[in-house]
Amino acid sequence: MLNRVKLEIKDPMDWNTMYQESEIYSGIHNMNNGLPSNSFLPTDVSTVPTSMPYMSNGLSGPVTSIQGNLGSLGSMTQGMVGSLAPPASTPAYPMGYCQGESEFQRDPRTYRRNYSHAKPPYSYISLITMAIQQAPNKMMTLNEIYQWIIDLFPYYRQNQQRWQNSIRHSLSFNDCFVKVPRSPEKPGKGSYWTLHPESGNMFENGCYLRRQKRFKCERSKSGEREKKVNKPGDENGGSLKETPVGYDDCSSSRSPQAPVNDGGRDSTGSSIHQASGGSPVGLSPTSEQAGTASQLMYPLGLSNDGYLGLVGEDVHLKHDPFSGRHPFSITQLMSSEQDQTYPSKLEMCPTTDHLVHYSNYSSDYHNMASKNGLDMQTSSSTDNGYYANMYSRPILSSL
């Protein structure tokens, strides 16, 4: 027996040869590490000190029994831990609880907006009026109105561009809002907006849900009346603009006489100007000279009344009053020529009498004949008399 004890003391691992593998329990050091570190089981229980001098053979039985009980306890704890562990195929949280927010997705159809995020039942004019009336100075800039609406109604924190455009249109196209420019004392960007002094009764008893009536400024009404009044004036102005056209119509009725007058001037040269008042009005020729001139210049049988009418039109032409006083002026040269040409024209009258009987012929032939007669008349005058009278001042021009 002592030899056996000594053998145990020398080599404690020889116990394995005495028991089968099925009868040997694993020590507590082989237990699962999943147990907490502060477990009630000691880690060095398997190493039982056997080198005590008082140990006898009777103590070996209790030691082995204790070690066997501890081994069975370790196997029980390992089995319990294995049964509590979830299977590898199933997820740890099958219901989806306690997961991260990134993995959780809420169905948008089941989501209902809170009452605070719902659209307010106020119009844009009501919102602007509320913002301005709650301001300390009863005026706000456009950005201040935007900020006031966003702070009070969370619904307008989304789609800001849409409703901000509507706010601007409401401010511009309603007479109840007045734009006030900034004063030099308060520099900044943007003008102020305030309520019209006469627009206090737009809402019933301060209820902004519905307007009582649409406010219109009296000034705008008067402007519309002025526009309506100015419309008939524009029509009258159009009729006044059409009056020159009527004047052209009247002048066109006289157009048949215009070629006759122009033809008379072209065919006679400067003699019409002499007879019709090329000189001042006081130097007009006598009626007899006018009659003889009419026979010479108009052999087609024009009446004296028609000719005098044409002459009367030329009398009213504007002439230079100082043109007759200069010795080399055209009027004096033509007046000096007039004194010499008229006697020769009287002498030429018998030669042109035969042209009167052929009044049915074309006017071109008679105008050509009368023009040739005048050319012969001017060529027959001597140059000595012409130059002698050119430098002398006529008696009539001095009047």
Curated annotation (Swiss-Prot):
Main localization (coarse): nucleus
Region (Disordered): 219-290
Coiled-coil stretches: none
InterPro entries: Fork-head_N (IPR013638), Fork_head_dom (IPR001766), Forkhead_box_C (IPR018533), FOX_domain-containing (IPR050211), TF_fork_head_CS_1 (IPR018122), TF_fork_head_CS_2 (IPR030456), WH-like_DNA-bd_sf (IPR036388), WH_DNA-bd_sf (IPR036390)
Subcellular location(s) per record: Nucleus
UniProt biased composition (Basic and acidic residues): 219-234
Keyword Transcription included in the entry's annotation: yes
Record protein name field: Forkhead box protein A4
